[in-house]
Amino acid sequence: MSDIFKLDKELVKQLVRLREDFGLCAVKAEFEAEGASFRDLVRLRRITIQQGIPLYLKIGGAEAIRDIKDAFELGVDGLIAPMIESPFAVAKFLNAYKSIYGDQKIFKSINVETRQAAENIEDLLKIAANSIDNITIGRTDLSQSYYDEKIQPDSEFMLNLIESLSQKVVDAGLTLTIGGSLTKTSIERFRGRSKEWAGKVTSLETRKIILPAGIMLEKHKALEESIKFEELYLQSKLEIAKMLTEFDRERLFKLKSRL
């Protein structure tokens, strides 16, 4: 039990460090790829709200009403819709959002992470303008959607594609986040495009942490400290799961002893 509280303190300490030293934009949680439970989200909401840090929830799809209801109950600060490929999907997300939140405004972002979405970007932005705040480019899925082994997240093709998309996003009045398997190599490649991306790419993200692009690219250990938060979060999550299953294990043993 003591390990859980110790990890919790380390988690908060790391969050504060990211806020104070690296300009932390927000913490992310996912119902989609991460498969977070409602309990996981409650913990993250408790920790982030105590420190005055925004929490964004990546829902399971454009029209994931159940996820949006959970987001409303938790009081998250933003919603992220994955795999948005068409103007219709943007409209579905906005309608689902309004069905729960009405006129209440929170941060809204959509993920461009397939070839189809990239090719439809201008049509997507026509619907998204004045309604969506941010576009996130998910490089991992986006590169895989081309079915070409030469096209990898850090490839020249992807860097050129991001540059092309970024100008269209900015022209539409939205901010731009880049994510998808960020590594030290990614950061080095991005630095080579820093002049071209200046004023276009707003932030960079790992699975859990969103930092300003300039800080992630230029400040020593920004990526390392972002990943450290996720490591602590996963360790804490595993310890809690271990504790909760231990109660069930003991109960099962008692039941068997009665037979």
Predicted segments, located by residue:
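Expand to "…catalyze enediolate/carbanion chemistry for C-C bond making/breaking, isomerization
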Residues: 1-259
